Design a protein with these regions (language model features):
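Conserved strand-to-helix beginnings and helix N-cap segments that scaffold or border functional pockets
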Residues: 1-4, 31
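Short alpha-helical functional segments enriched in proximate histidine and acidic residues
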Residues: 6-9, 13, 71, 75
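Short secondary-structure junctions
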Residues: 12-23
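Conserved C-terminal structural/oligomerization subdomain of aldehyde/semialdehyde dehydrogenase
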Residues: 23-25, 32-161
Length: 161
């Protein structure tokens, strides 16, 4: 499966499995894969550059906010990210500068059905939820009504024609 291939490649590239990393042997049927956390991940590894859509998470330690912004923006995807910090001002600087659809601070995947959800770059077009999603179905039309009915010289000329 795609998950098995991604995990195997990450191991070959030098990422270290902290937990998981294999299919569960507790289920005879199905494709249940153990939640997997990787450490010692570098920015050029596929496990961090490609969307996994599986219970696999790479952990990459960074030294500065600038490094995090540059690394995040270097990928072709932009669905969501989470930052854990006590410095909300720095977190908001990251939110302003990272090209991402959903930016979570101190909590992954906080869901709010009134808030727009969707990615940037190759992680999707458009938004679900919120007024932004409704805008996808709206077609604007301008309607102007002149209740005055008087001649407008600027439009009809001096004779009202």
């Amino acid at each position: 499966s795609n998950t098995i291939n991604k995990v195997d490649l990450a191991k070959k590239e030098g990422a270290r499995v902290l937990t998981g990393g294999k299919q569960s042997d507790q289920f005879e049927k199905g494709y249940f894969y153990e939640p997997t956390v990787f450490d010692q991940v570098t920015p050029n590894m596929e496990i961090i550059m490609e969307e996994a859509f599986s219970p696999v998470i790479p952990v990459h330690r960074i030294k500065s906010l600038d490094e995090a912004i540059a690394m995040s923006n270097s990928t072709r995807y932009g669905l969501g990210c989470t930052i854990f910090t006590r410095d909300i001002e720095r977190a908001l600087t990251g939110a302003d500068n990272i090209q991402i659809g959903t930016f979570c601070i101190n909590s992954p995947l906080m869901e709010n059905m009134a808030a727009p959800f969707g990615g940037m770059k190759q992680s999707g077009i458009g938004r679900e939820h919120g007024i932004e999603a409704l805008e996808e179905f709206r077609e604007a039309k301008h309607i102007f009504i002149d209740y005055d009915h008087s001649n407008k010289e600027w439009w009809f000329g001096n004779n009202g024609e």
